[in-house]
């Protein structure tokens, strides 16, 4: 019972952290894509690649890449920074891997919603003297809240149901998915595993119905139809440069982790 309770708390904690981080990073990517005029076309192509990678690759790829790059015998940790006691296992490792895996889903969901916000509403606020930050906090963000909640729940469900990443990089951090597996293969307790599976299934189904029949309707009611005019992109460098640099670095890092996997076979 104690093991189940620990696994349940760990699973909820992991889902909450991953959901918040994935939604936040996905929102930043969507905002840059929709509101900022990207100076270089390759940045836009990089964003498109990042959005497709989680769809076409196995879910455990980033865990494997993280171990190869930053583990105790990692290419970067050992051969570049000469760190021989690097520990990527546990909650922090799973959070990083799941966030990098799932935030593109939030990015794609929120990108479509941002495009449907009528720019005339935001421009009217700007015309009466509201700052760019105030427009975002008082107009854009409130309109996006149902969509952000939707993206958060989808990511939460993905995180809770994920088995491969916690199994590879979780270490002694048990989740419901890994505990159920070990209950069957290690303890040969199929009855206990079935009971835990019912709890996990119930949790994901409850979240799914909230996302499907409550938040999805709110999102549709908030953002309907098409924008009445073309959105003028943000040109203020104090806004565009930090956001673009952050998103480009994150996207390049994700692509690097996928690209480096074949090279991992060359190192012991």
Go through the PLM ranges and name each one.
Residues 68, 162-187:
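Glycine-rich helix-loop "coupling/hinge" segments at transmembrane-helix boundaries
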Residues 178-203:
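Helix-loop-helix hairpin linking two adjacent transmembrane segments in secondary transporters
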Residues 45-48, 81, 119-127, 138, ...:
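Short amphipathic alpha-helical coupling elements at transmembrane boundaries
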């Amino acid at each position: 019972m104690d093991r189940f309770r620990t696994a349940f708390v760990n699973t909820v904690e992991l889902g909450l952290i991953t959901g918040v981080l994935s939604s936040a990073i996905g929102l930043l990517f969507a905002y840059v894509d929709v509101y900022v005029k990207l100076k270089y076309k390759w940045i836009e192509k990089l964003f498109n690649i990042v959005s497709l990678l989680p769809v076409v690759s196995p879910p455990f790829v980033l865990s494997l890449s993280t171990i190869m790059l930053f583990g105790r015998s990692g290419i970067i940790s050992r051969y570049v920074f000469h760190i021989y006691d690097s520990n990527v296992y546990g909650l922090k490792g799973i959070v990083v891997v799941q966030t990098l895996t799932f935030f593109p889903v939030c990015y794609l969901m929120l990108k479509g919603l941002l495009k449907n916000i009528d720019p005339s509403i935001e421009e009217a606020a700007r015309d009466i003297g509201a700052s760019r930050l105030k427009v975002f906090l008082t107009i854009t963000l409130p309109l996006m809240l149902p969509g952000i909640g939707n993206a958060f729940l989808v990511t939460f469900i993905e995180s809770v149901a994920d088995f491969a990443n916690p199994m590879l990089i979780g270490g002694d951090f048990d989740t419901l998915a890994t505990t159920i597996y070990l209950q069957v293969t290690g303890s040969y307790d199929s009855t206990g595993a079935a009971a835990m599976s019912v709890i996990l299934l119930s949790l994901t189904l409850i979240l799914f119905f909230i996302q499907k029949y409550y938040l999805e309707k709110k999102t549709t009611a908030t953002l309907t139809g098409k924008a009445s005019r073309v959105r003028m992109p943000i040109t203020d460098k104090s806004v565009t440069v930090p956001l673009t640099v952050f998103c480009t670095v994150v996207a390049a890092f994700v692509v690097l982790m996928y690209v480096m996997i074949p090279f991992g076979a060359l190192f012991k």
